[in-house]
Amino acid sequence: MNTAFILLAQYNGIVIIPLERVCRDYFSHLTPEKLKLKIASGDIDLPLVAIEKSQKAARGVHLNDLATYLDAQHQKAKMEHEKLMGRGSGQSP
């Protein structure tokens, strides 16, 4: 399964997804402003794209960056699950 293709379909071909939509779809526990702060502080490893240099410019997330982030979160969850099941630390079950 290719996450980028799924996102492309989900967002109808939009390459730069508005921050508000990313927040609503994947970070619903945060406000867009809180998401922006977490990204700026490095708590969430997701590059923000500004359409122009103005501080008031719309910000969004490139589809490929969102796909990479989601895939990384998936890998972390799988590794945690493997550890929980006793399979990920080199131990025999």
Predicted regions and their residues:
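Major-groove DNA-recognition helix of helix-turn-helix-type DNA-binding domains
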Residues: 2, 25-60, 83-90
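Residue-level marker of intrinsically disordered, low-complexity segments enriched
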Residues: 14-15, 59-61
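A short, Lys/Arg-enriched interface patch at domain edges and termini
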Residues: 62-91
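Polyanion-binding surface elements
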Residues: 3-34, 69
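Short, structured coil/loop segments at alpha-helix boundaries
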Residues: 1-2, 75
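Helix N-cap / beta->alpha transition motif
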Residues: 18, 47, 62-65
